[in-house]
Amino acid sequence: MGKVIGIDLGTTNSCVAVMEGTQPKVIENSEGARTTPSIVAFTDDGERLVGQPAKRQAVTNPERTFFAIKRLIGRTYDDPMTQKDKGLVPYKIARGDNGDAWVEADGKKYSPSQISAFTLQKMKETAESHLGQPVTQAVITVPAYFNDAQRQATKDAGKIAGLEVLRIINEPTAAALAYGLDKKKSGTIAVYDLGGGTFDVSILEIGDGVFEVKSTNGDTFLGGEDFDNRIVEYLTAEFKKEQGIDLTKDKLALQRLKEAAEKAKIELSSATQTEINLPYITADNTGPKHLALKLSRAKFESLVDDLVQRTIEPCRKALKDAGVSASEIDEVVLVGGMIRMPKIQEVVKSFFGKEPHKGVNPDEVVAIGAAVQAGVLQGDVKDVLLLDVTPLSLGIETLGGVFTRLIDRNTTIPTKKSQTFSTAEDNQNAVTIRVFQGEREMAADNKLLGQFDLVGIPPAPRGMPQIEVTFDIDANGIVNVTAKDKATNKEHQIRIQASGGLSDADIDRMVKDAEANAEADKKRRELVEVKNQGESLIHATEKSVTEYGDKVPAADKGAIETAMTALKTALEGDDVEAIKARTTDLMQASMKLGEAMYAANQAAGPDAGAEAAASEKKDDVIDADFQEVDEKDQKKRA
């Protein structure tokens, strides 16, 4: 059995780790970094870039560079959060065939699961390169407050990337696993996780290797991206005030502003003031315009104060659901890049009444926890038991549009619960089961996860038939629902697939597409390598011909020139086999040059020796440093 890896699929950055013996290890990517930007881009010639290469070209290619895609995963196009996101990103968000939010580049639509799969593929390749063996299984993390559709879409992304997702694990729970792995202490901890796009808070009890989640809460549309956007809004408003030009319509300018905002935000975690300089940000008929202004930490904090305060209400709810007070929390663990902001640390300290624990790397701790869970599943990590919860209540729509809960939020998973319902009308021969997730009293105000029909109910007065509805939530937090007519034992079961969601056919198509892309990437890399090899050979041969061309017969020299010309012609095209063949031809033709070089060096050998001897005679005195070595020391060293 191959290694199971742990992946933190983040909104802004992703990270991969693996258990090496009893210790988790974060794996560096091909660029030597321990985290990889969750960014995917397509170039003019159709090449796909992932991670840092994609981020580097974002300013010049904003419409084909997809970032913060995790905010769209598992969401419908009509979701208010999708509509909000449309105004914040330079790329096109389009309606998928299934009604979900997809993205579009050059007329081709991609599902968020597909874009996320490209990042997961990069993580998979990073692990394979480090381990020296294929990787086919993974544990992937998601925000604790993700609903069923978002969890299912994340699992689909893993499948598209060629990974069997053994477990979907909540990010704060993963962080707690990493935090508590080597610590023998027990107690109640709060994990405050503010990442690039989502916020979660979980309350856990730890003791004797058992990690029990008591409650979780959060906001799947609150994170570092929102803090960046506040700076961008401030910069565009200030520029408009000064220059009278609206930069919000200029996608290139907006992308530059976004990069500058992220940089300023990071700098203000350690500095009290930063300067933002963007020369040639735009131009009008009077000439080019430059943006230059100072941003203080105090001003930044005032711009984002409401975002910081938005994290407190979920903390309050999580404590209430767990049945504990802030004073009963033994340790507060901070996770996610945004927790480096001093204001965040201050607010957390004020709310919980204690100094938060900063002993974990906020960018890597979630991936480390995922690797620990992978180790548990693989049997490498013993005596660790993880008991997670479902973040939202689950139920069905009943008469009058009421939301009837079958499983309450913060119920430990896996879990199974049944309830018996009946018909609303006389002689009703079918019922539609509509499954919802949320906390509102009316079904329509919650998230519709899916629906199905149970048909063939024998005619009977209303209220007589007995229909048993069973909810089954697995350890990934993914829901299965069964409806059964007790009179006939007729049963209908579905794995809840969001009203949109990807069908198996969609996933298969995307898997094939990903495999084809991987093959294309491999061919592109091979082409670059053989071209480099050919060009290096031409350079070396030309140099040798200049130096030793007069030492070889004219016929051999002519053959070398012909082979060189043929290789140069082949290098202008993209035929790998042709370039390889012409490279081999030139190598064989150049062998005569090698013989000439060797003969010339042999002939120069005696002369060179004579010169060296003459030189030695001229220099009668040789200066040298010397050191006396004790005989005993010499023996010791020997």
Curated annotation (Swiss-Prot):
Residues 602-613 have a biased composition (Low complexity). Keywords: ATP-binding, Chaperone, Nucleotide-binding, Phosphoprotein, Stress response. Induction: By stress conditions e.g. heat shock. The modification Phosphothreonine is found at T198. InterPro entries: ATPase_NBD (IPR043129), Chaperone_DnaK (IPR012725), Heat_shock_70_CS (IPR018181), HSP70_C_sf (IPR029048), HSP70_peptide-bd_sf (IPR029047), Hsp_70_fam (IPR013126). GO terms for molecular function: ATP binding; ATP-dependent protein folding chaperone; unfolded protein binding. Residues 602-638 are annotated as: Disordered. Residues 622-631 have a biased composition (Acidic residues). Acts as a chaperone. Belongs to the heat shock protein 70 family. This is Chaperone protein DnaK.
